[in-house]
Amino acid sequence: MPTLRFPFHLANHNKDAAINILIIFISIGSIIFNVNYFHTTIVKNGQIINQPTNAFQSDFSLAALWRNENHAGVKDANPVAVNQETPKLSIALNGIVLTSNDETSFVLINEGSEQKRYSLNEALESAPGTFIRKINKTSVVFETHGHYEKVTLHPGLPDIIKQPDSESQNVLADYIIATPIRDGEQIYGLRLNPRKGLNAFTTSLLQPGDIALRINNLSLTHPDEVSQALSLLLTQQSAQFTIRRNGVPRLINVSVGELTGMNGLRHERTQ
């Protein structure tokens, strides 16, 4: 079978044509790539930043949020009050017995015409939503629906008490400060001192710093009886104190009349 022979110059011509076609396709592809690249390139502040479209939208949203937070001219007509003032408690704190154990500490509170005793985390009978959260030496912290309020022992008592025309309305606690004395969890008496600005003890047999072991028949080493003794001072005009002074127990009768200098009688007996 005869073999067809092509001229050599024709073969070279076809090879050059194929190379030219390939170059054309490469050029077209490069042009398309460059068009797409510059289409998705953002020129900002003289810098070329490549980022997808959704990233630009996110950046714009953050900028809009910043403008709304800092430069918005429209304010909420009905803003929500964060801290609303809670009415103050209408109670009278009459006494505090503080021990090293929070569970044995308690307070005496006047609610209406009655005096109540409360321990830590107890709710008030007159206000079931109010709880005792902390008992301090001279104050108590109450919580009412997340609002905390501190009530101080005898907050309205002036430094100097004016003497009334008659002492008939005054009680022993108007002239005597009784502070529980503790040794760890054990209470072993009440330390007695005159109220600031008063010279009440100069007209009685009491001396500043005296330690009372008993008041009437109440032992001041038991928390329950200490509570009753503090209540007695808040309601009575006279009482018998068992005082330990220089290691010697003494019985001293004390009255409002003696503390005000209106009564010259003094009663003391050494046990």
Curated annotation (Swiss-Prot):
Residues 1-17 are cytoplasmic. Induction: Silenced by the DNA-binding protein H-NS under standard growth conditions. Keywords: Cell inner membrane, Cell membrane, Membrane, Protein transport, Transmembrane, Transmembrane helix, Transport. It comes from the Bacteria. Residues 39-271 are periplasmic. It is found in: Cell inner membrane. SUPFAM superfamilies: PDZ domain-like. PROSITE patterns: T2SP_C (PS01141). The chain crosses the membrane at residues 18-38. Part of a cryptic operon that encodes proteins involved in type II secretion machinery in other organisms, but is not expressed in strain K12. Involved in a type II secretion system (T2SS, formerly general secretion pathway, GSP) for the export of proteins. This is Putative type II secretion system protein C.
